[in-house]
Amino acid sequence: MSGAWIFVCGPSGSGKDSVIASARKMLGKNQNVVFARRMVTRAVQFGSDHDPLTEPAFMALLQVGELAWHWQAHGYHYAISQRYAADVKAGRLVVVNGSRAHVQALPASPNLRVVKISCDTHRLAARLAQRGRDSSAAVAQRLARNEQLTELHADYEVANNADLATAGQSLANYLSG
């Protein structure tokens, strides 16, 4: 694969962060793959991997063109720094923990690939409840949103229904292939 943005998408609770972290560990020091850090207008919580920023800081970065990608979901702003565009131009893959709704709104591009992390609905519900981040009403909203966004066109799909190592290896194989 030549330089590209790799958007890893899937419903909340599908294990995107865990699958990405597993693949990252398996790839080691592979210089052709860069894992972008998301910026989110939310405090860091256990199990999340992002750089927190305030809403005014987000708006300032947006106004000066420092964001390559940005979207809104679940009441928060998410963003990827413009600095990663240089990696894509240099022929590297830049892995982004993205949003299904955002990716569906993007125009087709030869340097954009979508990887879908899928998971059975009953596992999603259990994982969302277990992490304790959301109220039961918010969990129900996330599950309903998942039903609305099931038709994501993806270039590759990783099933994360059982063994995390298997899912991580599947993503690592795609990124290194």
Regions found by a protein language model. Give the residues of each.
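ATP-dependent small-molecule kinase phosphotransfer cores
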Residues: 38-94, 98-100
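Conserved phosphate-donor/acceptor-positioning beta-strand/loop module used by diverse small-molecule
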Residues: 95-98, 108-130
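P-loop (Walker A) phosphate-binding loop of NTP-binding proteins
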Residues: 11
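Walker A/P-loop
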Residues: 17
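Post-Walker A helix-loop "phosphate-sensing" segment adjacent to the P-loop in P-loop NTPases
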Residues: 25-35
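Small-molecule kinase domains that catalyze NTP-dependent phosphoryl transfer to phosphate-bearing small molecules
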Residues: 130-177
